[in-house]
């Protein structure tokens, strides 16, 4: 499958979304281009991701000092406590502003990991590797990060753009039907807002 690259630009940030099949193995080269001075990586992993994909990513990152964290992810996980715990752990490993947090999971994990990256030393590098269709087409793009409060969802957060998004469509083969339906619903919503001919193409 051809590798596609989309360039995203905001008033204060530019980054690429790399889309392709079986591109996890090339993660290291993409990271070196977007974060050339990184030495330490906090790899934050959703426990639902099959181990073979985790192994592929870790093999690609073997030249970096990688600290791995696996979590069972749900809405309760998306808390200030867990975001601060991740941030404090990175600080305990002497992360500096050149170092990196990678989120390898769905939207909840990306939101929390990105928020943690935004508050460590006022912002360290963040890369999103979304593992669900919904995250690939929606939550990994746009820089919205945050956690839940006792007063409601996503009330504590920041707009913090990633340095890179790596969307490997091979990951989608491991998803249950419900996860795929959620992703397609978001695609349909976007298509209806943007272009009617794209909406027709979906059917």
What are these regions (language model features)?
Residues 55, 79-82, 112-115, 137-140:
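Short, conserved acidic/polar surface loops in the N-terminal third of protein domains
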Residues 9, 114-203:
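A glycine/threonine-rich phosphate-anchoring loop and its flanking beta-alpha core
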Residues 1-100, 189:
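ATP/NTP phosphate-donor binding region
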Residues 25, 50-51, 108-110, 173:
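Glycine-rich nucleotide phosphate-binding loop and flanking beta-alpha elements
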Residues 83-89, 106, 119, 127, ...:
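Hydrophobic, well-ordered secondary-structure scaffolds
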Residues 99-118:
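Glycine/serine-rich anion-binding loops at beta->alpha junctions
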Residues 46, 111, 168:
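Acidic active-site catalytic centers that drive phospho-/nucleotidyl reactions
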